[in-house]
Amino acid sequence: MLQERKLILITRKTRLQELKEKYCTLGQAKFYIEHLGERFDNYVAEDALYVEAQKTVLTHLKESGRVQLLERSMLSTYLFANDDIIVVLGQDGLVANTLKYLKGQPLIAINPIPDLYDGVLLPFCVSDTLEALNNVLRSRMSVKRISMAQVTTNLGDSMLAVNDVFIGPKTHTSARYKICVGEATEQQSSSGVIVSTGLGSTGWFKSILAGASGIAQRPLHKQLSNGFAWDSADLYYSVREP
């Protein structure tokens, strides 16, 4: 059944497609991969599975309405309408990257290759596409909301972060910081500070805590061992390198 809301399918180039663009021919790409000691047929198989998943999802979406196919590199320049429905053919990184350009539009995250990708942010398979879309259209969907961090520099530039914000020199050399949160102030010196959201709390933040726990020989805080809520208003600050 056709409906008026536009369906935006977000995709990304496969590793094989990126290699073909970089080295111009499959032969050159194969030589490079095998020179690294990797199996080139893994790249070919992954590409075939992703392309097939994209065709299937696109077919399902076209049965329901107008579809706009959008590659990841175009995200920063695309203007989403308020009533657009976003469908991401993941990995997790593509979902996170897409979220920061949205303003409350529903996002359906699909895992194109469940046997290959660990989809923490990908609750749906390709076969779930129509059911998930129909639930959104009928407002019957189960929604998981997230909170993002907004960063503003002293020059007035602003950006949104879905997982983490890294504050520090590009060279990762040590620098001094004065951190002020409310009335609390702390002076420190490190190669950077990581500010994590709830969505990022099971990724980089968790690795940081595990490393700190190993160095200090102390167990992780129980409240943070499994991360914190995706929609939490809290932000956690971590020193990248003491």
Q: PLM features: what roles do these ranges have?
A:
Residues 2-7, 11-13, 18, 30, ...:
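Catalytic phosphate-donor-binding core of small-molecule kinases
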Residues 72-80:
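A short, basic/flexible loop-to-alpha-helix module at the beginning of a structural domain
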Residues 84-85:
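Structural motif
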Residues 88-92:
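N-terminal glycine-rich "phosphate-gripper" loop used for MgATP/nucleotide binding
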Residues 93, 112-115:
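Short, acidic/turn-prone active-site loops that include or flank metal/cofactor-
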Residues 94-99, 202-205:
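Short glycine/serine/threonine-rich phosphate/pyrophosphate-binding segments
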Residues 98-112:
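A short, gly/pro- and small-residue-rich
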Residues 199:
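Conserved binding/recognition cores within well-folded domains
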